Amino acid sequence: MNATLGYANQKVVSAIMAQLEKLMTYDMVEGGNAPAIELARAIAQVTAPGLTRTFFCNSGSEGIETAIKVSRRYHKLLNDSQRSLIVSLKNCYHGTTLAASTCATSSASDEQGLLPAGFVSVPGPDWEAVRREGLAVSHSGIEALEVFFAEHGENISAFIVEPVQGIGGYIVPDNYLRAARALCTQYGAHLILDEVLTGFGRTGKMFAYEYAHITPDLLITSKGLTAGYMSLAAVTTHDKIFDVFEREKEMSGFSHGHTHSGHASACAAGLAVLDILQNDGVLGRVQQLSTVLREAVGACAETATVREIRCRGLLMAVEFDSVQRALSIKKHLQDNKILIRRSGRNIIFAPPLNIDLADIEYLATQFLDAVRVASAQ
């Protein structure tokens, strides 16, 4: 999932090496470095209008922690400190650090008292209804979020959601995201989009939120930002959030940071990746290869052991009737030197965005063979 431009991409490697030979990095707390500044500007050029201010950290989990801190602090600066609730969807995944992991479990279910307070998970999309109604029109399941906002809206700091859930590869319907955006606006809460997995081309668009034609208040990206070559994450905020922090003179901006935040060599990698995505026709090719992959793998759709195939760009999930079936398919592919991800009873495809057509066809052929073998067991 990380190697979005494959291995040993010379444009990215050369950019990293060139930066290492000049200055590996420089502290961002009281200073800065040119690659970080340039990358922040470059991100502002490809995100939705208003998303112009970026804070760099080192991983998706750190990005989640940062976004939560920004959201809560924003409301406190506006003397709205009762807004502390962070709302997420059940069965989500946002990372393994303290607040990030609590998003997936909620404070209420913490019987041992180990997790921080103020986190609530609500039921998400009704996936069975989404299957029946179709991804393009469904917003089934939004009722649970509407009820929670109606009951607790004045206490909600932010709602955080992945446009495509990393666990299982479930695509959150565009209408659901639009309704969530409207709820956040209506009740004065922030919409935080976790695009750690989907950001920078994975779905065939630069960002997955483009499918729903919405703009988040905070956007978190990581994996595709450097294509896995260096550890880097970005929290990009809307101007309206930045302006509140800038007006608070005693804060001197956003008081937050890590030793390697905005690492210059990592940001150099990010600049090279963005250049490739924008100038080498990658996104258009992802759309074309997505069609090929979906049609090829779709040959197993009528197999009795296959429950559903979900695909957006070069991110595909094939759901089987059991975890054991998925394990068997993964082992068969590994035995044939194909590395693939399994999540529960789902097999997840996330090949490099610049993969060759021949490799896509080979991957699909080997997968169909694995399905035939596993289905006969």
Labelled PLM ranges:
Residues 1-377:
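Conserved N-terminal phosphate-binding loop of PLP-dependent enzymes in the Aspartate aminotransferase
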